[in-house]
């Protein structure tokens, strides 16, 4: 009896265990993995559409796509775009194996519509991408199939722009960019690439637009734009491409020749920019300490603001230190009676952009500024510091000790590091902590030869805009040693503070420590400015090309890059464009090679500015694409087989 019960229990346990294993295998099957079998690497397959893909005379506004497995649509708002553009965003819903797109705008008669999903469609379990997919239909008798493709780059640094709209207008006058939505539209990917599909034969102009308000037209200076004067005539021809079938990562099986239709143009280059004269507004005014307050603006202006003091004369009591474009301005109070006030009351008139018209206008605001640290608090802190010093002196006196420590007081401070060595073509700069006058008789530049120091000629120049910044110009010679000496009280501020004595030794590096670079630019004219870059944002040197050359001397050894731009207005800086004036941003070029410069070496390079398209000019090290994971299938089964072979070989070695 016990034997029967035992055998019966074992039989049932065995069945239950087998069922559990089957269940675990079934649960593990989706996607499989190490090591429940091969991975699922098959992308989703489209089984059918309603209306039929490529259908004609379609009137319904609901589109249904059915796939062979459950799917997902990734970042639909960013990746999916309907052309002609829809002012009211279409609704995209996913349910299992089905995608439903509802077009909410009325359909235009006799028009080809495309729904470009880019690479957004993936299977729901493993995320295998379907690849770039576009659904299309026509509301008329004809389906337009032409395509226009290219890239969009930032005009100032040739960085590919992701997510900007690129559109076509069949009306060729400039005004349509501001007054009408695009006829056809696409959106760029992370590489700045776009492909506008469903284009009918005809003549077009192309535009790019970072559409801030969703109306598919250029609305204002805050929107990044690009435009081309070229008239585009789409065309096509039969072509072939070659597809290599690989056995593994090293060996290939065969090369297939695949016929396809080649659409032109396929290499448009649009350089996008924000217009010069961006909307200007007063961002904030801050008064952290009694002595000064600072105004911050969102954009530069050629016109400096004015202060109309309430209860004081701004013209005689304020000193102004500003940036070159008047976007940051600091006002120093030099009247001691004004400093003692807790509240500074004034009217401030400045140039701003009118919200309704977008035009520059003068605006006046009234302010009452109270410093975070009031003068009363400042005086209390000084009194407390003096009291501590006096007590310390008293303790030292009682111990019979003397002290050389001076009583606490405010001094004019120097900032700006003077390097121990300097190139012969550089100069010394320093910044003072507060507005001051300088007695140059108390400043000495000493040339040291052996152990003898002699006065060397120099020139001290205050900055044109920043009244705290100074430059010391000298007759520097390679290999020489100097000492800059500033006597005590040579600097006296508007608050009657003086400087402590200051000295700094430095040397002029010998020629052997530097590299030189000579760049031959056959297409250069007098408008070309060539920049030597230490990084994308750091301009090390800048010269204007002369006689087809740009020469750089006294370069510290290191890695560098070259950028150039056409300085048409001769202001030594890159300038943006203006659409209404038909003015493009100044053209930028990059030298495609990275330069490794060594000490005591002269390097010569020849640079043909237009030898490469913009997409291939920028050195790899400077390319700063917003890397998004490319939606391509992974060969995980190949990886799995390699891992299994690796483990097998390991077991054989151990055995």
Predicted feature descriptions by range:
Residues 2-655:
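N-terminal targeting or signal-anchor segments and their processing/structural boundaries
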């Amino acid at each position: 009896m016990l034997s029967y019960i035992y055998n019966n229990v074992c039989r049932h346990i065995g069945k239950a265990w087998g069922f559990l294993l089957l269940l675990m295998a079934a649960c593990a099957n989706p996607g499989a993995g190490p090591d429940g079998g091969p991975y699922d690497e098959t992308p989703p397959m489209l089984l059918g559409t309603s209306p039929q893909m490529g259908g004609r005379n379609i009137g319904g506004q609901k589109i249904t796509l059915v796939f062979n497995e459950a799917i997902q649509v990734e970042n639909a708002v960013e990746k999916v775009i309907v052309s002609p553009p829809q002012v009211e965003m279409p609704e995209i819903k996913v349910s299992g194996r089905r995608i439903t797109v509802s077009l909410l705008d009325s359909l235009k008669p006799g028009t080809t519509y495309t729904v470009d999903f880019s690479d957004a469609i993936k299977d729901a379990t493993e995320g295998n991408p379907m690849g770039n997919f576009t659904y299309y239909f026509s509301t008329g008798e004809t389906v337009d199939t032409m395509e226009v493709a290219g890239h969009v780059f930032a005009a100032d640094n040739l960085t590919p722009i992701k997510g900007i709209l690129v559109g076509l207008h069949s009306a060729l006058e400039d005004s349509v960019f501001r007054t009408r939505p695009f006829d056809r539209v696409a959106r760029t990917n992370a590489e700045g690439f776009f492909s506008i599909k469903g284009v009918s034969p005809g003549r077009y102009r192309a535009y790019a637009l970072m559409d801030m308000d969703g109306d598919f037209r250029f609305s204002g200076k805050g929107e990044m734009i690009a435009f081309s004067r070229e008239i585009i005539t789409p065309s096509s021809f039969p072509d072939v491409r070659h597809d290599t079938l690989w056995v593994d990562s090293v060996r290939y099986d065969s090369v297939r020749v695949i016929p396809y239709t080649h659409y032109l143009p396929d290499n448009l280059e649009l350089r996008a920019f924000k217009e010069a004269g961006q909307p200007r507004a007063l961002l904030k005014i801050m008064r952290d300490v009694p002595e000064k307050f600072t105004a911050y603006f969102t954009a530069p202006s050629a016109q400096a603001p004015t202060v109309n003091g309430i209860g004081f004369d701004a013209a005689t009591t304020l000193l102004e230190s500003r940036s070159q474009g008047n976007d940051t301005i600091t006002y120093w109070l030099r009247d001691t009676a004004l400093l003692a006030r807790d509240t500074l009351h004034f009217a401030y008139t400045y140039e701003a952009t009118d919200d309704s018209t977008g035009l520059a206008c003068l605006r006046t605001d009234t302010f009452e500024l109270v410093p975070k640290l009031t003068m009363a608090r400042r005086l209390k802190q000084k009194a407390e510091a003096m009291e501590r010093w006096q007590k310390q002196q008293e303790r030292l006196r009682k111990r019979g000790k003397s002290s050389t420590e001076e009583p606490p007081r405010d001094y004019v401070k120097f900032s700006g590091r003077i390097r121990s060595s300097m190139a012969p073509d550089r100069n010394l700069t320093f910044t003072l902590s507060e507005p001051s006058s300088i007695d140059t008789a108390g400043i000495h530049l000493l040339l040291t030869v052996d152990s003898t120091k002699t006065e060397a000629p120099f020139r001290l120049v205050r900055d044109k805009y920043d009244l705290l910044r100074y430059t010391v110009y000298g007759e520097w010679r390679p290999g020489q040693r100097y000492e800059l000496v500033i006597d005590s009280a040579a600097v006296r501020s508007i608050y009657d503070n003086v400087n402590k004595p200051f000295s700094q030794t430095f040397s002029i590096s010998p020629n052997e420590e530097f590299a030189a670079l000579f760049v031959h630019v056959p297409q250069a004219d007098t408008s070309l400015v060539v920049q030597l870059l230490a990084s994308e944002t750091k301009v090390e040197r800048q010269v204007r090309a002369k006689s087809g050359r740009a020469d750089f001397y006294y370069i510290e050894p290191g890695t560098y890059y070259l950028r150039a731009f056409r300085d048409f207005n001769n202001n030594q800086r890159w300038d943006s464009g203006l659409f209404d004036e038909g003015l493009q941003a100044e053209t930028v070029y990059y030298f495609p090679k990275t330069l490794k410069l060594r000490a005591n070496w002269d390097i010569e390079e020849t640079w043909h500015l237009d030898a490469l398209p913009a997409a291939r000019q920028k050195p790899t090290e400077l390319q700063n694409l917003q890397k998004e994971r490319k939606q391509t299938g992974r060969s995980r089964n190949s990886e799995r087989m390699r891992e299994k072979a690796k483990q097998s070989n390991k077991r054989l070695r151990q055995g």
